[in-house]
């Protein structure tokens, strides 16, 4: 007996089998994959941080 892992598509919530039969995993389709990429590119999604580091003295573009 083989265990099949099923995850929900992060874009639409549709169930996706985690395996070679699902080439866009964790997404259900290329469309959902591109929607997610567009959200990251438009900065609608971001990785949470502990604070605003834009004014940090540790970061400098000067060499």
Swiss-Prot record:
Entry superkingdom: Bacteria
GO biological process per UniProt: regulation of DNA-templated transcription
Cofactor names: Zn(2+)
SUPFAM superfamilies referenced in this protein's UniProt entry, alphabetically: Glucocorticoid receptor-like (DNA-binding domain)
Membrane-traversing stretches: none
Keywords, in A-Z order: Metal-binding, Zinc
InterPro entries reported for this sequence: DNA_gyrase_inhibitor_YacG (IPR005584), Znf_NHR/GATA (IPR013088)
Residues reported to bind Zn(2+): 9, 12, 28, 32
Cofactor note: Binds 1 zinc ion.
GO function terms (MF aspect): DNA topoisomerase type II (double strand cut, ATP-hydrolyzing) inhibitor activity; zinc ion binding
Family the entry assigns: Belongs to the DNA gyrase inhibitor YacG family.
Described purpose of this protein according to its UniProt entry: Inhibits all the catalytic activities of DNA gyrase by preventing its interaction with DNA. Acts by binding directly to the C-terminal domain of GyrB, which probably disrupts DNA binding by the gyrase.
Subunit note: Interacts with GyrB.
Protein name: DNA gyrase inhibitor YacG
